[in-house]
Swiss-Prot record:
Changing D246N: Loss of activity, still binds DNA. GO terms for biological process: DNA restriction-modification system. It catalyses: Endonucleolytic cleavage of DNA to give specific double-stranded fragments with terminal 5'-phosphates. Its EC number is 3.1.21.4. Keywords: DNA-binding, Endonuclease, Hydrolase, Magnesium, Metal-binding, Nuclease, Restriction system. This is Type II restriction enzyme BsoBI. It comes from the Bacteria. Homodimer.
C-alpha cells in the first residue's frame, strides 16, 4: 500500500518550498514586462490627447474642444468612477481648477503640463490594475499547467469562458488552445468514470468567503443549474493561490491564506466533511515555508507548491487531475 503523501512527489524538505533569489528576479522581470505591455494603451491615449489639444493657443481654449473634456476632467484628478457622482457644474469647476492652478502657470508649456497630469493619474489607474494582475497571472499559469497535465494524460476536457457570466456554456477543448488560460473560469474532465469540475474564485456559502480554487465532484453541465457550490459534500478540494512576487508581502499573504484555509477546514469539519486543502504561492519566505511544511507533515494541509518552480506546479496539477 502506498503511504506516500501527495506533496512528497515534489517536496523533499522545507527548503524546496522557498523562493530563491533567481526566482524572485525572474518574477520581477516578468511582472515588469507585463506592466510595460499593459501601459501601451495609456501612453497611446496620452499621445492622442496631445494631438487633439495642440490646436489650443491658450489653456482656456481647451474648454472649447468638446472631444477632450473627459480627458481634461481625468487630468484634473477625477477618475471615471468618481465622475459618476459629479454634476456638470462640478466637472466644469474641476477642469477650471486644473487650468487656473496648473496649466496657466506653465505658460507656453501648458500642453506638456496637461499631458504630464493626465499620465500621472493614468499611472494611478495602471497601478490599481497591476495590483490585480499578479493574481490573474498566477491563475493563468496554474490553468496552463492543469490543461498540460490533462493533455499529456490524453484526458479530454471542457472549459468555461469567464466572459460567459451565466456560467453554463461549457465548451470542448479547442483545436488551438492558445491563450485559453486567459479567459478560463473553470475546467472539467472525467477520470476513471469520475466527473471533476474545477472553478476559480468562487464564493463558498459555507465559509461565506471567496476561495481561489475549488474542485467539485460533479459534471460541468449541472454545476450552475443545481447550484453545486451550495452543496458542501460536493467539494473535493479548496485552495488558496497567491501570485504576488514581492518578498516583503509574502508573510502577510500567507497569513491571509492560512486564516482562510483554517476557516475552510473548521466549517467543513462541522459538517463532518474533510475536503483536501492546498496552498500555492510565488513568494515563499523562510518562516512561512516552515509553517507550510509543518502543516503538510501533520496533514492539516494536503499539498502545496511554489508557483515559481515549474516542476512543483506540474506535479501538483498531475495530482489534482487524478483526485
Amino acid at each position: 500500500m502506498n503511504t506516500q503523501k501527495p506533496f512528497e512527489n515534489h517536496l523533499k524538505s522545507v527548503d524546496d518550498l522557498k523562493t530563491t533569489y533567481e526566482e524572485y528576479r525572474a518574477g520581477f522581470i516578468a511582472f515588469a514586462l507585463e506592466k510595460n505591455k499593459r501601459s501601451t494603451p495609456y501612453i497611446e491615449r496620452a499621445r492622442a490627447l496631445k494631438v487633439a489639444a495642440s490646436v489650443a493657443k491658450t489653456p482656456k481654449d481647451l474648454l472649447y474642444l468638446e472631444d477632450i473634456q473627459d480627458a481634461l476632467l481625468y487630468a484634473s484628478g477625477i477618475s471615471d468612477k468618481a465622475k459618476k457622482f459629479l454634476t456638470e457644474d462640478d466637472k466644469k469647476e474641476s477642469i477650471n481648477n486644473l487650468i487656473e492652478n496648473f496649466l496657466e502657470p506653465a505658460g507656453e508649456e501648458f500642453i506638456d503640463e496637461l499631458i504630464f497630469r493626465y499620465l500621472l493619474f493614468q499611472g494611478d489607474s495602471l497601478g490599481g490594475t497591476m495590483r490585480n494582475i499578479a493574481g490573474a497571472l498566477a491563475q493563468q499559469k496554474l490553468t496552463r499547467a492543469i490543461i498540460s497535465a490533462l493533455d499529456i494524460a490524453n484526458i479530454p476536457y471542457k472549459w468555461l469562458d469567464s466572459r460567459d457570466k451565466k456560467y453554463t456554456n461549457w465548451m470542448d477543448k479547442p483545436e488551438d488552445d492558445y491563450e485559453l488560460e486567459t479567459f478560463a473560469k473553470g475546467i472539467s474532465w472525467t477520470i476513471n468514470g469520475k466527473h471533476r469540475t474545477l472553478m476559480y474564485n468562487i464564493t463558498v456559502p459555507l465559509v461565506k468567503k471567496n476561495v481561489d480554487i475549488c474542485l467539485f465532484n460533479c459534471e460541468p453541465e449541472i454545476y450552475t443549474p443545481q447550484k453545486v457550490h451550495q452543496q458542501p459534500e460536493k467539494y473535493l478540494l479548496l485552495g488558496e493561490l497567491k501570485g504576488g512576487i514581492d518578498p516583503a508581502g509574502a508573510d502577510e499573504h500567507w497569513k491571509t491564506a492560512n486564516t482562510a484555509l483554517t476557516r475552510i477546514r473548521n466549517k467543513f469539519s462541522e459538517k463532518g466533511l474533510s475536503p483536501k486543502t492546498i496552498f500555492i504561492g510565488a513568494a515563499i519566505e523562510h518562516s512561512m515555508a516552515e509553517e507550510i511544511w509543518d502543516q503538510l507533515q501533520s496533514g492539516s494541509l494536503t499539498n502545496s507548491a511554489n508557483l515559481t518552480k515549474t516542476e512543483q506546479v506540474g506535479s501538483l496539477c498531475r495530482w489534482i487531475i487524478n483526485i
